[in-house]
Protein backbone atom coordinates (compact mmCIF):
# COMPACT_ATOMS: atom_id res chain seq x y z
CA UNK A 1 0.00 0.00 0.00
CA UNK A 2 1.03 3.59 -0.65
CA UNK A 3 1.10 5.81 2.43
CA UNK A 4 1.83 9.51 2.91
CA UNK A 5 2.83 11.04 6.25
CA UNK A 6 2.64 14.82 6.68
CA UNK A 7 3.90 17.12 9.39
CA UNK A 8 2.02 20.34 8.64
CA UNK A 9 2.68 23.26 10.96
CA UNK A 10 4.49 26.56 11.23
CA UNK A 11 7.86 24.92 11.83
CA UNK A 12 9.82 21.79 10.89
CA UNK A 13 7.44 20.55 8.20
CA UNK A 14 8.35 17.17 6.71
CA UNK A 15 6.93 14.52 4.41
CA UNK A 16 7.38 10.75 4.24
CA UNK A 17 6.11 8.49 1.46
CA UNK A 18 6.33 4.73 1.28
CA UNK A 19 5.05 2.17 -1.19
CA UNK A 20 5.63 -0.59 1.36
CA UNK A 21 9.20 -1.13 0.21
CA UNK A 22 11.12 2.09 -0.29
CA UNK A 23 10.90 5.18 1.91
CA UNK A 24 11.11 8.76 0.64
CA UNK A 25 11.62 11.57 3.14
CA UNK A 26 11.83 15.34 2.81
CA UNK A 27 12.48 17.91 5.53
CA UNK A 28 11.27 21.05 3.83
CA UNK A 29 13.95 23.21 5.46
CA UNK A 30 16.44 21.43 3.19
CA UNK A 31 14.18 21.87 0.15
CA UNK A 32 13.70 25.63 0.62
CA UNK A 33 16.94 26.46 2.45
CA UNK A 34 15.09 27.96 5.42
CA UNK A 35 15.94 26.51 8.82
CA UNK A 36 12.87 25.12 10.63
CA UNK A 37 10.75 25.87 7.56
CA UNK A 38 7.03 25.41 8.11
CA UNK A 39 4.13 25.48 5.69
CA UNK A 40 1.62 28.28 6.04
CA UNK A 41 -1.12 26.42 4.20
CA UNK A 42 -2.24 22.83 3.95
CA UNK A 43 -1.53 22.39 0.24
CA UNK A 44 2.16 23.25 -0.08
CA UNK A 45 3.16 19.63 0.44
CA UNK A 46 2.00 18.96 -3.12
CA UNK A 47 5.30 20.56 -4.23
CA UNK A 48 7.08 17.56 -2.73
CA UNK A 49 4.72 15.03 -4.33
CA UNK A 50 5.21 16.69 -7.71
CA UNK A 51 8.97 16.45 -7.23
CA UNK A 52 8.59 12.75 -6.49
CA UNK A 53 6.12 12.26 -9.39
CA UNK A 54 3.43 10.96 -7.02
CA UNK A 55 -0.27 11.73 -7.45
CA UNK A 56 -2.70 12.07 -4.55
CA UNK A 57 -5.20 9.79 -6.29
CA UNK A 58 -2.63 6.97 -6.21
CA UNK A 59 -2.35 7.06 -2.40
CA UNK A 60 -4.11 4.51 -0.19
CA UNK A 61 -4.05 6.62 2.99
CA UNK A 62 -2.73 9.88 4.44
CA UNK A 63 -1.81 10.64 8.06
CA UNK A 64 -1.34 14.23 9.21
CA UNK A 65 0.31 15.67 12.30
CA UNK A 66 -0.73 19.23 13.08
CA UNK A 67 -0.86 20.89 16.49
CA UNK A 68 -4.18 22.63 15.74
CA UNK A 69 -6.37 19.58 16.43
CA UNK A 70 -7.60 18.83 19.94
CA UNK A 71 -7.92 15.16 20.87
CA UNK A 72 -10.11 13.62 23.53
CA UNK A 73 -8.40 12.15 26.60
CA UNK A 74 -6.75 8.86 25.68
CA UNK A 75 -7.39 9.41 21.96
CA UNK A 76 -4.31 8.93 19.76
CA UNK A 77 -5.81 9.45 16.30
CA UNK A 78 -8.96 10.53 14.49
CA UNK A 79 -10.26 9.92 10.98
CA UNK A 80 -10.88 13.09 8.97
CA UNK A 81 -12.97 14.01 5.96
CA UNK A 82 -10.82 16.43 3.99
CA UNK A 83 -12.03 15.60 0.53
CA UNK A 84 -9.03 13.48 -0.44
CA UNK A 85 -9.65 10.39 -2.59
CA UNK A 86 -8.28 8.16 0.19
CA UNK A 87 -8.77 7.68 3.92
CA UNK A 88 -7.18 10.45 5.95
CA UNK A 89 -6.22 10.48 9.63
CA UNK A 90 -4.98 13.01 12.15
CA UNK A 91 -2.43 11.49 14.53
CA UNK A 92 -1.58 12.83 17.98
CA UNK A 93 1.73 14.72 17.95
CA UNK A 94 3.26 12.76 20.85
CA UNK A 95 1.98 9.41 19.60
CA UNK A 96 3.66 10.13 16.25
CA UNK A 97 6.90 10.97 18.05
CA UNK A 98 6.82 7.55 19.70
CA UNK A 99 6.00 5.69 16.49
CA UNK A 100 8.81 7.50 14.64
CA UNK A 101 11.29 5.27 16.48
CA UNK A 102 10.69 2.43 13.99
CA UNK A 103 13.80 3.04 11.78
CA UNK A 104 16.14 2.40 14.75
CA UNK A 105 14.36 -0.69 16.09
CA UNK A 106 11.03 -2.23 16.98
CA UNK A 107 8.84 0.42 18.58
CA UNK A 108 8.66 -0.39 22.32
CA UNK A 109 5.29 -0.87 24.00
CA UNK A 110 6.06 1.97 26.43
CA UNK A 111 7.21 5.38 25.28
CA UNK A 112 8.01 8.66 27.01
CA UNK A 113 7.70 11.89 25.04
CA UNK A 114 8.99 15.27 26.27
CA UNK A 115 9.01 18.39 24.11
CA UNK A 116 7.90 22.02 24.00
CA UNK A 117 4.29 21.11 23.42
CA UNK A 118 2.11 18.94 21.20
CA UNK A 119 -1.63 18.65 20.68
CA UNK A 120 -3.76 20.05 23.50
CA UNK A 121 -0.67 21.89 24.81
CA UNK A 122 0.79 18.66 26.22
CA UNK A 123 4.46 18.87 27.20
CA UNK A 124 4.74 15.22 28.30
CA UNK A 125 2.97 12.03 27.31
CA UNK A 126 3.28 8.43 28.42
CA UNK A 127 2.44 6.09 25.54
CA UNK A 128 1.40 2.51 26.25
CA UNK A 129 0.63 0.53 23.12
CA UNK A 130 -1.79 2.63 21.09
CA UNK A 131 -2.97 4.67 24.07
CA UNK A 132 -1.75 8.06 25.24
CA UNK A 133 -2.29 7.20 28.89
CA UNK A 134 -0.79 10.09 30.90
CA UNK A 135 -0.20 13.69 29.84
CA UNK A 136 1.02 16.91 31.43
CA UNK A 137 -0.30 20.31 30.40
CA UNK A 138 2.42 22.84 29.57
CA UNK A 139 0.33 25.72 30.89
CA UNK A 140 -0.09 24.08 34.30
CA UNK A 141 3.20 22.25 34.81
CA UNK A 142 5.54 23.91 32.35
CA UNK A 143 7.63 22.39 29.59
CA UNK A 144 11.31 21.48 29.70
CA UNK A 145 11.83 22.67 26.13
CA UNK A 146 9.96 25.93 26.62
CA UNK A 147 11.55 26.76 29.97
CA UNK A 148 15.03 26.24 28.53
CA UNK A 149 14.17 28.41 25.53
CA UNK A 150 12.94 31.13 27.88
CA UNK A 151 16.34 31.11 29.58
CA UNK A 152 17.95 31.62 26.19
CA UNK A 153 15.77 34.66 25.58
CA UNK A 154 16.57 36.00 29.05
CA UNK A 155 20.34 35.90 28.49
CA UNK A 156 20.05 37.36 24.99
CA UNK A 157 21.08 34.41 22.83
CA UNK A 158 20.45 34.70 19.10
CA UNK A 159 17.45 32.73 17.93
CA UNK A 160 15.21 31.91 15.02
CA UNK A 161 11.82 33.71 15.16
CA UNK A 162 10.24 30.89 17.21
CA UNK A 163 13.22 30.25 19.46
CA UNK A 164 13.49 26.62 18.37
CA UNK A 165 17.29 26.48 18.68
CA UNK A 166 17.49 28.12 22.09
CA UNK A 167 17.12 24.98 24.23
CA UNK A 168 20.11 23.40 22.50
CA UNK A 169 22.21 26.52 23.04
CA UNK A 170 21.21 26.66 26.70
CA UNK A 171 22.25 23.01 27.08
CA UNK A 172 25.77 23.96 26.00
CA UNK A 173 25.83 27.11 28.13
CA UNK A 174 24.77 25.31 31.33
CA UNK A 175 28.07 23.45 31.57
CA UNK A 176 29.90 26.71 32.34
CA UNK A 177 28.23 26.99 35.74
CA UNK A 178 28.76 25.20 39.05
CA UNK A 179 26.18 23.10 40.87
CA UNK A 180 24.85 24.81 44.00
CA UNK A 181 24.16 21.86 46.31
CA UNK A 182 22.00 23.89 48.69
CA UNK A 183 19.75 25.11 45.88
CA UNK A 184 19.69 21.62 44.35
CA UNK A 185 18.19 20.36 47.61
CA UNK A 186 15.76 23.27 47.71
CA UNK A 187 14.23 22.52 44.31
CA UNK A 188 14.11 18.78 45.04
CA UNK A 189 10.92 19.44 47.03
CA UNK A 190 9.15 19.96 43.70
CA UNK A 191 9.85 16.43 42.46
CA UNK A 192 9.89 16.26 38.68
CA UNK A 193 6.37 17.04 37.50
CA UNK A 194 6.26 20.77 38.18
CA UNK A 195 8.80 22.00 35.65
CA UNK A 196 7.63 25.60 36.09
CA UNK A 197 8.68 25.64 39.73
CA UNK A 198 12.00 23.90 39.06
CA UNK A 199 12.93 26.45 36.38
CA UNK A 200 11.64 29.45 38.36
CA UNK A 201 14.54 31.89 38.36
CA UNK A 202 12.78 34.19 40.82
CA UNK A 203 13.32 31.68 43.62
CA UNK A 204 17.08 31.92 42.97
CA UNK A 205 17.10 35.72 42.87
CA UNK A 206 15.20 35.79 46.15
CA UNK A 207 18.03 33.75 47.60
CA UNK A 208 20.99 35.61 46.12
CA UNK A 209 19.48 38.93 44.96
CA UNK A 210 21.51 39.11 41.75
CA UNK A 211 21.12 39.19 37.99
CA UNK A 212 21.24 36.06 35.86
CA UNK A 213 23.66 33.56 37.34
CA UNK A 214 25.14 30.70 35.33
CA UNK A 215 25.28 28.58 38.49
CA UNK A 216 21.48 28.65 38.68
CA UNK A 217 21.28 27.34 35.13
CA UNK A 218 23.79 24.56 35.77
CA UNK A 219 21.96 23.54 38.94
CA UNK A 220 18.45 23.32 37.49
CA UNK A 221 19.71 21.73 34.26
CA UNK A 222 21.58 19.08 36.26
CA UNK A 223 18.60 18.46 38.53
CA UNK A 224 16.23 18.12 35.58
CA UNK A 225 18.52 15.58 33.90
CA UNK A 226 18.98 13.60 37.10
CA UNK A 227 15.24 13.43 37.73
CA UNK A 228 14.46 12.52 34.12
CA UNK A 229 17.00 9.68 34.22
CA UNK A 230 15.58 8.43 37.52
CA UNK A 231 12.03 8.56 36.16
CA UNK A 232 12.82 6.70 32.94
CA UNK A 233 14.92 4.08 34.72
CA UNK A 234 11.77 2.80 36.45
CA UNK A 235 9.37 2.39 33.50
CA UNK A 236 5.69 1.97 34.23
CA UNK A 237 5.48 -1.53 32.76
CA UNK A 238 8.92 -2.65 33.87
CA UNK A 239 9.96 -2.88 30.21
CA UNK A 240 13.51 -3.90 29.32
CA UNK A 241 13.51 -1.34 26.50
CA UNK A 242 11.51 1.89 26.36
CA UNK A 243 11.11 4.56 23.71
CA UNK A 244 12.16 8.13 24.40
CA UNK A 245 11.46 10.92 21.92
CA UNK A 246 10.35 14.52 21.48
CA UNK A 247 12.55 17.58 21.26
CA UNK A 248 13.92 17.15 24.80
CA UNK A 249 15.36 13.79 23.68
CA UNK A 250 17.89 15.83 21.66
CA UNK A 251 19.50 16.88 24.98
CA UNK A 252 22.72 14.87 24.92
CA UNK A 253 23.52 15.64 28.55
CA UNK A 254 20.21 14.16 29.71
CA UNK A 255 20.65 11.17 27.40
CA UNK A 256 24.04 10.41 28.91
CA UNK A 257 22.46 10.31 32.35
CA UNK A 258 19.65 8.04 31.10
CA UNK A 259 22.06 5.56 29.50
CA UNK A 260 24.17 5.51 32.66
CA UNK A 261 21.21 4.02 34.57
CA UNK A 262 21.42 0.85 32.46
CA UNK A 263 17.81 1.14 31.31
CA UNK A 264 17.39 0.00 27.71
CA UNK A 265 16.19 2.94 25.65
CA UNK A 266 15.69 3.72 21.96
CA UNK A 267 16.26 7.36 21.01
CA UNK A 268 15.97 8.23 17.31
CA UNK A 269 18.26 10.81 15.68
CA UNK A 270 15.10 12.61 14.54
CA UNK A 271 13.58 12.86 18.04
CA UNK A 272 12.40 16.41 17.40
CA UNK A 273 9.55 17.38 15.07
CA UNK A 274 11.53 16.55 11.92
CA UNK A 275 10.65 12.89 12.55
CA UNK A 276 6.88 13.24 12.87
CA UNK A 277 6.02 12.19 9.30
CA UNK A 278 7.95 8.95 9.91
CA UNK A 279 5.64 8.29 12.83
CA UNK A 280 2.65 9.08 10.61
CA UNK A 281 3.44 6.36 8.06
CA UNK A 282 4.12 3.86 10.86
CA UNK A 283 0.65 4.63 12.20
CA UNK A 284 -0.81 3.85 8.77
CA UNK A 285 1.20 0.64 8.47
CA UNK A 286 -0.24 -0.59 11.75
CA UNK A 287 -3.73 0.62 10.96
CA UNK A 288 -3.82 -1.32 7.69
CA UNK A 289 -1.84 -4.33 9.01
CA UNK A 290 1.00 -4.06 6.52
CA UNK A 291 4.46 -5.62 6.85
CA UNK A 292 7.18 -3.62 8.65
CA UNK A 293 9.06 -1.11 6.52
CA UNK A 294 12.69 -1.59 5.53
CA UNK A 295 15.18 0.75 7.20
CA UNK A 296 17.84 0.18 4.54
CA UNK A 297 20.06 3.23 4.14
CA UNK A 298 18.82 4.92 7.32
CA UNK A 299 19.56 7.61 8.53
CA UNK A 300 20.72 8.96 5.16
CA UNK A 301 17.22 9.47 3.76
CA UNK A 302 17.12 13.19 3.03
CA UNK A 303 15.68 13.96 -0.39
CA UNK A 304 18.60 16.15 -1.40
CA UNK A 305 21.35 16.28 -4.00
CA UNK A 306 23.83 13.41 -3.82
CA UNK A 307 27.17 13.25 -5.66
CA UNK A 308 27.32 10.76 -8.51
CA UNK A 309 30.43 9.00 -7.18
CA UNK A 310 31.83 7.90 -3.84
CA UNK A 311 35.40 8.79 -2.86
CA UNK A 312 38.01 6.26 -3.94
CA UNK A 313 41.00 5.20 -1.85
CA UNK A 314 43.23 7.95 -3.24
CA UNK A 315 40.71 10.69 -2.43
CA UNK A 316 40.22 9.31 1.08
CA UNK A 317 43.98 9.25 1.59
CA UNK A 318 44.29 12.91 0.53
CA UNK A 319 41.42 13.86 2.86
CA UNK A 320 43.10 12.04 5.76
CA UNK A 321 46.36 13.87 5.03
CA UNK A 322 44.45 17.17 5.22
CA UNK A 323 43.11 16.23 8.66
CA UNK A 324 46.52 15.00 9.79
CA UNK A 325 48.02 18.34 8.82
CA UNK A 326 45.53 20.28 10.96
CA UNK A 327 43.30 21.47 8.12
CA UNK A 328 39.52 21.99 8.24
CA UNK A 329 37.85 19.48 5.92
CA UNK A 330 34.30 19.68 4.54
CA UNK A 331 32.82 16.28 3.65
CA UNK A 332 29.75 15.96 1.38
CA UNK A 333 28.71 12.39 0.50
CA UNK A 334 25.57 10.51 -0.52
CA UNK A 335 22.23 11.75 0.76
CA UNK A 336 21.96 13.82 3.92
CA UNK A 337 21.13 12.65 7.41
CA UNK A 338 17.67 12.77 8.98
CA UNK A 339 17.82 14.88 12.12
CA UNK A 340 19.98 17.82 13.24
CA UNK A 341 23.29 15.94 13.63
CA UNK A 342 25.86 15.43 10.89
CA UNK A 343 26.84 11.76 10.85
CA UNK A 344 29.43 11.65 8.11
CA UNK A 345 27.53 12.70 4.99
CA UNK A 346 27.26 16.46 5.59
CA UNK A 347 30.17 17.17 7.92
CA UNK A 348 32.91 19.63 8.77
CA UNK A 349 35.85 17.66 10.18
CA UNK A 350 39.01 18.57 12.05
CA UNK A 351 41.58 17.08 14.41
CA UNK A 352 40.19 16.46 17.88
CA UNK A 353 43.53 17.59 19.35
CA UNK A 354 43.70 21.10 17.90
CA UNK A 355 43.50 23.53 20.83
CA UNK A 356 42.26 26.43 18.69
CA UNK A 357 39.69 24.45 16.71
CA UNK A 358 36.71 25.40 18.85
CA UNK A 359 37.40 29.14 18.68
CA UNK A 360 38.25 29.05 14.99
CA UNK A 361 35.26 26.95 13.92
CA UNK A 362 32.71 28.87 16.00
CA UNK A 363 34.01 32.30 15.00
CA UNK A 364 35.22 31.91 11.42
CA UNK A 365 33.32 28.95 9.95
CA UNK A 366 30.04 28.37 11.79
CA UNK A 367 29.58 32.03 12.88
CA UNK A 368 27.95 31.13 16.17
CA UNK A 369 28.39 31.64 19.92
CA UNK A 370 31.91 31.05 21.25
CA UNK A 371 30.76 28.67 24.00
CA UNK A 372 29.13 26.11 21.68
CA UNK A 373 30.77 22.66 21.94
CA UNK A 374 31.62 20.20 19.16
CA UNK A 375 30.96 16.50 18.92
CA UNK A 376 33.34 13.72 17.94
CA UNK A 377 33.23 10.74 15.60
CA UNK A 378 35.17 7.71 16.82
CA UNK A 379 35.66 4.19 15.52
CA UNK A 380 33.33 2.03 17.58
CA UNK A 381 36.02 -0.48 18.52
CA UNK A 382 38.18 2.30 20.01
CA UNK A 383 35.47 4.19 21.92
CA UNK A 384 36.60 3.13 25.41
CA UNK A 385 40.16 4.25 24.60
CA UNK A 386 39.04 7.88 24.53
CA UNK A 387 35.73 8.00 26.43
CA UNK A 388 34.17 6.53 29.55
CA UNK A 389 31.61 4.66 27.46
CA UNK A 390 31.46 1.20 25.96
CA UNK A 391 28.16 1.17 24.07
CA UNK A 392 26.73 2.27 20.75
CA UNK A 393 26.07 5.91 19.93
CA UNK A 394 25.69 5.95 16.13
CA UNK A 395 23.49 9.07 16.08
CA UNK A 396 25.61 11.44 18.21
CA UNK A 397 22.83 11.98 20.75
CA UNK A 398 24.67 11.05 23.97
CA UNK A 399 27.29 12.97 25.95
CA UNK A 400 29.88 10.93 27.85
CA UNK A 401 32.96 11.72 29.98
CA UNK A 402 36.23 12.22 28.08
CA UNK A 403 39.20 10.10 29.26
CA UNK A 404 41.89 11.45 26.92
CA UNK A 405 42.88 14.93 28.11
CA UNK A 406 44.43 15.69 24.74
CA UNK A 407 41.07 15.86 22.92
CA UNK A 408 40.83 19.60 23.50
CA UNK A 409 38.67 20.52 20.50
CA UNK A 410 35.84 18.13 21.41
CA UNK A 411 35.96 18.28 25.22
CA UNK A 412 33.33 20.57 26.68
CA UNK A 413 34.05 22.67 29.75
CA UNK A 414 32.41 20.01 31.98
CA UNK A 415 34.73 17.28 30.63
CA UNK A 416 32.12 15.66 28.40
CA UNK A 417 31.73 15.08 24.67
CA UNK A 418 28.81 14.23 22.40
CA UNK A 419 30.00 11.17 20.48
CA UNK A 420 29.17 9.29 17.31
CA UNK A 421 30.43 5.71 17.19
CA UNK A 422 31.34 4.63 13.66
CA UNK A 423 31.63 1.13 12.23
CA UNK A 424 31.03 -0.57 8.88
CA UNK A 425 32.89 0.18 5.66
CA UNK A 426 31.27 3.27 4.16
CA UNK A 427 33.42 6.19 3.04
CA UNK A 428 33.29 7.93 6.43
CA UNK A 429 34.46 4.81 8.29
CA UNK A 430 37.21 4.35 5.69
CA UNK A 431 38.31 7.96 6.24
CA UNK A 432 38.55 7.40 10.00
CA UNK A 433 40.56 4.21 9.51
CA UNK A 434 42.96 5.91 7.11
CA UNK A 435 43.37 8.77 9.61
CA UNK A 436 44.09 6.21 12.34
CA UNK A 437 46.68 4.57 10.11
CA UNK A 438 48.45 7.92 9.68
CA UNK A 439 48.17 9.33 13.21
CA UNK A 440 47.33 6.50 15.60
CA UNK A 441 44.10 8.32 16.46
CA UNK A 442 40.65 7.13 15.42
CA UNK A 443 38.69 10.12 16.71
CA UNK A 444 38.00 13.44 14.94
CA UNK A 445 35.86 16.52 15.49
CA UNK A 446 32.60 16.24 13.53
CA UNK A 447 30.11 19.09 13.12
CA UNK A 448 27.37 19.81 10.61
CA UNK A 449 28.03 21.41 7.22
CA UNK A 450 26.17 24.68 7.73
CA UNK A 451 26.50 28.11 9.26
CA UNK A 452 24.46 29.45 12.15
CA UNK A 453 20.84 30.12 11.17
CA UNK A 454 20.90 27.94 8.03
CA UNK A 455 19.96 24.29 7.54
CA UNK A 456 22.57 21.64 6.76
CA UNK A 457 23.74 21.86 3.14
CA UNK A 458 21.48 19.86 0.83
CA UNK A 459 22.80 20.93 -2.57
CA UNK A 460 26.31 20.75 -3.95
CA UNK A 461 26.33 24.47 -4.74
CA UNK A 462 25.51 25.24 -1.08
CA UNK A 463 28.53 23.21 0.02
CA UNK A 464 30.73 24.97 -2.51
CA UNK A 465 29.48 28.36 -1.35
CA UNK A 466 30.56 27.53 2.22
CA UNK A 467 33.95 26.42 0.89
CA UNK A 468 34.39 29.69 -0.99
CA UNK A 469 34.25 31.65 2.26
CA UNK A 470 36.79 31.96 5.04
CA UNK A 471 37.72 28.96 7.15
CA UNK A 472 37.45 25.65 5.29
CA UNK A 473 40.74 24.48 3.73
CA UNK A 474 39.70 21.34 1.86
CA UNK A 475 36.37 20.01 0.58
CA UNK A 476 35.49 16.54 -0.68
CA UNK A 477 32.27 16.19 -2.69
CA UNK A 478 31.82 12.63 -3.84
CA UNK A 479 35.16 11.74 -5.41
CA UNK A 480 36.16 15.35 -6.10
CA UNK A 481 38.63 17.03 -3.77
CA UNK A 482 39.03 20.81 -3.72
CA UNK A 483 41.92 22.65 -2.06
CA UNK A 484 42.49 26.33 -1.38
Annotated model-derived regions:
Residues 172, 177-219:
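Active-site cores of enzymes that catalyze phosphoryl transfer or operate on phosphate-rich substrates
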Residues 44-60, 232-240:
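Phosphate/pyrophosphate-binding loops at sites that engage ATP/ADP/AMP, CoA/4′-phosphopantetheine
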Residues 218-242:
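Phosphate/ATP-binding catalytic cores across multiple sugar-kinase/actin-like superfamilies
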Residues 50-90, 100-101:
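Short beta-strand-loop/turn "lid" adjacent to the catalytic site in phosphate-handling enzymes
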Residues 69-71, 241-257:
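Glycine-rich phosphate-binding loops at beta-strand->alpha-helix junctions
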Residues 30-40, 218:
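Active-site pocket-shaping loop/turn-to-helix segments
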Residues 7-34, 82, 86-98, 103-172, ...:
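Flexible beta->alpha loop and helix N-cap segments adjacent to enzyme active/binding sites
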Residues 1-4:
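Extreme N-terminal starter segment of soluble prokaryotic enzymes
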Amino acid sequence: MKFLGLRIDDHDSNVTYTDGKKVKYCATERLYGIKHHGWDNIWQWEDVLNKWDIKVEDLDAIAIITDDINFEEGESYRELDMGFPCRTFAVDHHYAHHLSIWPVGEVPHTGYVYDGYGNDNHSFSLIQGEKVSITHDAEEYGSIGTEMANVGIQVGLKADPQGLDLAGKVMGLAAYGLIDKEYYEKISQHGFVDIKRIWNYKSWTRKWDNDFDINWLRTVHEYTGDQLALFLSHPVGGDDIIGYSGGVAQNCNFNGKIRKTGQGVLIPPHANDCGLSLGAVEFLRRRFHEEPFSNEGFPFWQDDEAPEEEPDDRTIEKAAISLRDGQILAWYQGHGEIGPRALGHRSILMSARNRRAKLHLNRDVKHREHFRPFGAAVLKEDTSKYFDYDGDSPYMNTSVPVLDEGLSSVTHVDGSCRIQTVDGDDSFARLLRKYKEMTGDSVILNTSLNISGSPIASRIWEAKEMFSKKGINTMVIGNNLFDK
